[in-house]
């Protein structure tokens, strides 16, 4: 079999994960990178996105310029004593425990958030215009049997086609590439409603301060029976971002999965809560309601020369602030491996190594994020809002996520890639098929 010395990579989706991957791949001059985005331009939905210390480090390893893109728009808590505080968790129920401190969870970087659109705009500046193709909704992937040609043909809704040696789906929770990879009928091919909705809204900081004082300046989470109210500053302290959550919703009639909601509905869902969360909810104007979805765990993230990453691979609920960070970690591992892809015959070993290194960790994020919400909503059946047990559970709970040795993860991936290539070379007479490795699904131990 003849392999091409130039390798074409099609990235489906131009969100934070897809652009981070493109920035990394472009450092290998042997790769021809193209991004196919459904929208008419690069765009992100939602206000703030948080990146933990692991995600910020991953950005820096991909490209210092990518990390700078986050840094110039990042907002932290405003009080110096909150420099390393992720969230100050408080009891949000009314009554004698109203406002009780449950714990302050700290990490290296504290709570750092950025407006999604502004962050994306900065990443776009690092991408050559000619590699971006808009209005390209993928409808089908077909393997091209022609020897010596590109291995896959992509069919788009507008009637156009494209070809690539490698296809990487960064096309989000409703991923077309995931459906191609797993099969339309696979139970993990499409997202599921988690029974949770969030209400999102923004409050001008001066209005918020008038109502709740210094609580507006920093990151707080008010936890209570069946829900929580999360607040933190964005836009360099000009705005208070508010996320109110209820995890007691049995069904969602959708799509759409995001819709306007009247203010009275939100207030009713938090009626009888404690002083501060009640005041915050009263201030919300024109809130939106979001259905929270995730995926059943995929048994693998690649097949042949097709792979998925980010939300397309492991969409998670947002309750550990880790979804975007895991997409960036995916991009780091993939771009590290593809620095070693010098011909098209090395694509599959690179994707196999990526799959084996990333599957367990990312699926643990999905499982523990669901567990985190149960803790926040006082219905985990162990802590249930008890302050002492809360501190026991949260002591070191996030260390595995934030403290990941990313350089070691890269080395593990590269070493596995080398092992696969060596085995491939030692069996030239019959090209082995590097099939997906079905790791067991990680479960939480909270």
From Swiss-Prot:
Belongs to the paxM FAD-dependent monooxygenase family. This is 6-methylsalicylate 1-monooxygenase atA. It is a single-pass membrane protein. Its EC number is 1.14.99.-. Terreic acid is a metabolite with antibiotic properties. Terreic acid also acts as a selective inhibitor of human BTK kinase in mast cells and other immune cells. Pathway: Secondary metabolite biosynthesis. Its cofactor is FAD. The active site is at residue 200. PANTHER family: FAD-BINDING DOMAIN-CONTAINING PROTEIN-RELATED, HYDROXYLASE, PUTATIVE (AFU_ORTHOLOGUE AFUA_3G01460)-RELATED. It is found in: Membrane. 6-methylsalicylate 1-monooxygenase; part of the gene cluster that mediates the biosynthesis of terreic acid, a quinone epoxide inhibitor of Bruton's tyrosine kinase. The first step of the pathway is the synthesis of 6-methylsalicylic acid (6-MSA) by the 6-methylsalicylic acid synthase atX. In the biosynthesis of 6-MSA, atX utilizes one acetyl-CoA and three malonyl-CoAs as its substrates and catalyzes a series of programmed reactions including Claisen condensation, reduction, aldol cyclization, and the hydrolytic cleavage that yields 6-MSA. One of its GO terms (biological process) is secondary metabolite biosynthetic process. It is an enzyme of class 1 (oxidoreductase).
């Amino acid at each position: 079999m003849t392999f091409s010395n130039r390798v074409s990579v099609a990235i489906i989706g131009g969100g934070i994960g897809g652009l981070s991957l493109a920035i990394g791949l472009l450092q290998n001059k042997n790769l021809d990178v193209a991004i196919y985005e459904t929208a008419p331009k690069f765009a992100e939905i939602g206000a703030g996105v948080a990146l933990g210390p692991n995600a910020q480090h991953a950005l820096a390893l991909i490209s210092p310029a990518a990390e700078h893109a986050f840094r110039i728009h990042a907002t932290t808590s405003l009080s110096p004593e909150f420099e390393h505080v992720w969230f100050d968790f408080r009891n949000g129920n009314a009554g004698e425990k109203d406002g009780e401190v449950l714990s302050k969870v700290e990490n290296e970087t504290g709570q750092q958030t950025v407006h999604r659109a502004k962050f994306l705009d900065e990443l776009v500046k690092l991408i050559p215009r000619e590699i971006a193709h808009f209005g390209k909704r993928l409808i089908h992937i077909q393997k091209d049997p022609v020897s010596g040609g590109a291995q896959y043909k992509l069919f788009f809704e507008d009637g156009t086609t494209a070809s690539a040696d490698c296809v990487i789906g960064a096309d989000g929770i409703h991923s077309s590439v995931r459906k191609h990879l797993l099969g339309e009928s696979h139970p993990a091919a499409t997202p599921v409603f988690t029974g949770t909705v969030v209400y999102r809204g923004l409050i001008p900081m001066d209005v918020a301060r008038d109502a709740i004082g210094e609580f507006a300046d920093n990151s707080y989470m008010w936890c209570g029976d069946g829900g929580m109210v999360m607040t933190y500053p964005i836009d360099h302290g000009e705005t208070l971002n508010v996320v109110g959550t209820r995890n007691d919703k049995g069904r969602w009639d959708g799509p759409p999965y995001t819709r306007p909601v009247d203010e009275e509905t939100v207030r009713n869902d938090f009626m009888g809560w404690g002083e501060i969360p009640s005041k915050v909810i009263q201030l919300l104007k024109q809130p939106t309601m979001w259905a929270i979805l995730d995926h059943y765990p995929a048994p693998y993230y690649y097949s042949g020369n097709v792979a998925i990453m980010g939300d397309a691979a492991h969409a998670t609920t947002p309750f550990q602030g880790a979804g975007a960070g895991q997409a960036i970690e995916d991009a780091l591992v993939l771009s590290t491996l593809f620095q070693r892809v010098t011909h098209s015959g090395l694509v599959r070993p690179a994707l196999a190594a990526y799959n084996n290194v990333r599957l367990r960790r990312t699926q643990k994020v999905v499982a523990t994020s669901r567990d985190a919400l149960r803790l926040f909503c006082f219905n985990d059946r162990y802590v249930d809002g008890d302050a002492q047990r809360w501190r026991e559970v949260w002591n070191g709970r996030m260390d595995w996520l934030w403290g990941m040795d990313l350089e070691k993860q890269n080395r593990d991936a590269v070493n596995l890639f080398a092992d696969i290539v060596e085995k491939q070379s030692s069996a030239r007479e019959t090209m082995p098929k590097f099939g997906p490795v079905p790791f067991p699904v990680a479960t939480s131990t909270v």
